[in-house]
Amino acid sequence: MGRGKIVIQRIDDSTSRQVTFSKRRKGLIKKAKELAILCDAEVGLIIFSSTGKLYDFASSSMKSVIDRYNKSKIEQQQLLNPASEVKFWQREAAVLRQELHALQENHRQMMGEQLNGLSVNELNSLENQIEISLRGIRMRKEQLLTQEIQELSQKRNLIHQENLDLSRKVQRIHQENVELYKKAYMANTNGFTHREVAVADDESHTQIRLQLSQPEHSDYDTPPRANE
């Protein structure tokens, strides 16, 4: 059998009412936390017990949630009333003009202008702001310089490696040229030797042939011819 339907009505017994309140309060706060995390929602929860005790939860801060709530309510009311909407935007424009004027004045003061009306405390505050700005500028400058140094170091290492590779290639080409020169020299030397041997052989054969072709001399002299 399924569970019976719970009747939603005030619990008369104070003890049971307190136990139920504690359980439901914890469950409600847990659900609010889950909603804020899962849905990236800004959640604000305010609970007052029957005894007047406050329980609350806010995903960011309760003040920011309430301020946002009040601003949204005002905007909704003004959207429903055109005249109120015009006044709302006029107030917004006035606030923005004041903020712009304050920023411009602060900028001029940080540039060293319009300092006559400032008190000692205001000047000290301005000096602190300038020092903070200078520290931020120096930190950013050091960061950029460090990055540039790292980039230059990387480029230097790359160039050094390229020079080493080129030097190895030049040495290898030089060695190959030396080997080719040696091979060509040996080939030429062997060619000259073969030609000299061939010429010597030809000369020897020629001398032998010349010697063989000469007439043989008789052991007896040719008799003189008779006088006619």
Swiss-Prot record:
It comes from Arabidopsis thaliana. Keywords: DNA-binding, Nucleus, Transcription, Transcription regulation. It is found in: Nucleus. This is Agamous-like MADS-box protein AGL21. Residues 86-176 form the K-box domain. The keyword Cell membrane does not apply. GO terms for cellular component: nucleus. GO terms for biological process: positive regulation of transcription by RNA polymerase II. Specifically expressed in root. Probable transcription factor. Disulfide bonds: none annotated. Interacts with AGL15, AGL16 and AGL19. Interacts with SIEL. Residues 3-57 form the MADS-box domain. InterPro entries: MADS-box/MEF2_TF, MEF2-like_N, TF_Kbox, TF_MADSbox, TF_MADSbox_sf. GO terms for molecular function: DNA-binding transcription factor activity; protein dimerization activity; RNA polymerase II transcription regulatory region sequence-specific DNA binding.
